[in-house]
C-alpha cells in the first residue's frame, strides 16, 4: 500500500513540472505616450495609449510623438519620434527571460532597473547592428533620416552606452562581438564600425534615462494578469474558429458522399 501512495504522489508532480517549463509571454505595456504613437497587430493599426498591452510580433511606432514601453519586470524602452520597432520575442522559461526587439527605423533608449536573471538575454537589432545586454542604459540608433527634425534626429547610426556594458555585433556577422563600456560608442555602417568615446552632444542626451522608470511591482502584476486573461480569450477564439472550420470541412465531406 505505501508503494501505491508513493506512485500516486510522484505521478501527481509530473504535470506541475511540465507546467513550470511551459514558456509564457512577458508583459509589454505602454507607460507613457506623448503625441502620435501607434501599434500594428494582425494587419490592423490603432493608437497606443497609456496601459496599452502589447503582444509578441506587434509593431509599435511613433510619428510626431514618443512612447515609453515596459518590457518584462525590469526594462523600459523609449521610442523617439519617427521610430518603429517590432517586439520579436517576449518569452520567459524557467525564470529566464528572452527579449528580442527589432528597430526598423529611428532611435530607441533602453534602461534596466535591475539586472536580468542569469541565462536571460535582451537583444535589440537595427538594420546594421545588434546590441545584447542583461542590465544597462544605452541608445541604439538606426541613423535614418526622420520625416521631420526633432530632438533626437541628430543621433547617428550606432550604439551609445550610458551605464553598464553592451555587446555589439554587426547585423551580418553576429559572431563578431565588440564590448562597450560606459561612455563609449560604436558608429558607422555594417562593414566599418568604429569604437570610440561618446561625443559630448550625445552625453547630454543621456539625461533622459533619469525619466525612465518601471511601474510598481503591484501594478505590474495586475497588468500581467490582464495580459494572461487576454491571451486565454484569444486562444479560445482561435480554437473556436478551428472547430468551426473542422465542422465545415466535415459537412462538405458528408454532402459529397
Tell what function each PLM region has.
Residues 2-7, 19-25, 44-49, 63, ...:
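C-terminal interaction modules
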Residues 10-17:
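Hydrophobic h-region of N-terminal signal peptides that target proteins for export
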Residues 23-32, 87:
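A structural signal for short, hydrophobic beta-strand segments that form beta-sheets
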Residues 29-58, 68:
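N-terminal targeting signals for Sec/Tat export/insertion, comprising classic cleavable signal peptides
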Residues 35, 60-131, 159-168:
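Short, small-residue-rich packing micro-motifs
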Residues 48, 54-56, 73, 118, ...:
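Short, solvent-exposed loop/turn positions at domain surfaces
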Residues 135-137:
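Elongated, acidic membrane-bridging lipid-handling scaffolds
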Amino acid at each position: 500500500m505505501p508503494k501505491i501512495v508513493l506512485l500516486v504522489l510522484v505521478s501527481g508532480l509530473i504535470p506541475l513540472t511540465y507546467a513550470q517549463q511551459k514558456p509564457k509571454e512577458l508583459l509589454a505595456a505602454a507607460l507613457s505616450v506623448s503625441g502620435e504613437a501607434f501599434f500594428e497587430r494582425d494587419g490592423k493599426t490603432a493608437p497606443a495609449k497609456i496601459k496599452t498591452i502589447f503582444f509578441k510580433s506587434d509593431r509599435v511606432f511613433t510619428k510626431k510623438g514618443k512612447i515609453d514601453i515596459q518590457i518584462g519586470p525590469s526594462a523600459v524602452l523609449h521610442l523617439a519620434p519617427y521610430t518603429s520597432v517590432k517586439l520579436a520575442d517576449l518569452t520567459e522559461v524557467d525564470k529566464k527571460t528572452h527579449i528580442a526587439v527589432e528597430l526598423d527605423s529611428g532611435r530607441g533608449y533602453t534602461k534596466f532597473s535591475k539586472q536580468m536573471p542569469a541565462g536571460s538575454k535582451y537583444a535589440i537589432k537595427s538594420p546594421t547592428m545588434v546590441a545584447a545586454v542583461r542590465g544597462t542604459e544605452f541608445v541604439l540608433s538606426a541613423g535614418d533620416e526622420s520625416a521631420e527634425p526633432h530632438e533626437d534626429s541628430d543621433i547617428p547610426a550606432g550604439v551609445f552606452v550610458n551605464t553598464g556594458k553592451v555587446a555589439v555585433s554587426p547585423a551580418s556577422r553576429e559572431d563578431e562581438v565588440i564590448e562597450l563600456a560606459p561612455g563609449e560608442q560604436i558608429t558607422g555602417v555594417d562593414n566599418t564600425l568604429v569604437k570610440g568615446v561618446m561625443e559630448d552632444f550625445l552625453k547630454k542626451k543621456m539625461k533622459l534615462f533619469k525619466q525612465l522608470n518601471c511601474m510598481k511591482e503591484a501594478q505590474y502584476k495586475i497588468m500581467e494578469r490582464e495580459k494572461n486573461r487576454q491571451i486565454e480569450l484569444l486562444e479560445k477564439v482561435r480554437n473556436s474558429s478551428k472547430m468551426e472550420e473542422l465542422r465545415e470541412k466535415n459537412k462538405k465531406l458528408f454532402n459529397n458522399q
